[in-house]
Amino acid sequence: KEESQMLPNDLALLDIDQIIVDLEKNYPEFFWSPRISFGGLLDIPDSNGETKDQGPVVAMGIDLLSNNSRMIEIWKLNNNLILGRLPQTSNEALISQKLASKLNISVGDTATFIGTTMHNAFTTYNFPVVGTFDLRKGQADKQMMLIDISGAQLALDMENAASEIFGFTHSLFYDDDKAVNLRN
């Protein structure tokens, strides 16, 4: 139980496509969205490929690219985008404005994620930075990177897997009674 609270990706949900199909069938009053939460080191190379700066990163792979996704709306990314644009491909990243300032990251730079895969293997993955954001949540987005879930799955060897699956009412209005009933 304690390990599962830390959301390590070696305890990820597998076969999420089928899980989501089942959830949609059993709970049609909700829509479902997978997420991968992960952390590691972000390395920013200079023009020679040598480390210019690096620091810890808390990253989230969310569904930014599929046609029916509402994550851009839920995260209010159109309103919270400071520089650049939203990702258009699975390997593009948004970096929090605070992290960009701390690591001297500019839109157009490549950020190399260094971490571990779902199978605890070492991984590095290059993410072009296409934009910066500010969620206006204080420390919550201090070290944050957002990428499409398909890019996170590729970088972390998590094909058809996720850390968690979130359910939302179609109106995006939170109803505590419905949430408690669903949990029970």
Label every model-predicted segment.
Residues 10-160:
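A structural signal for hydrophobic secondary-structure junctions
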Residues 99-100, 161-183:
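A short beta-strand structural signal in non-transmembrane regions
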Residues 2-9, 134-136, 167-176:
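Structural beta->alpha junctions
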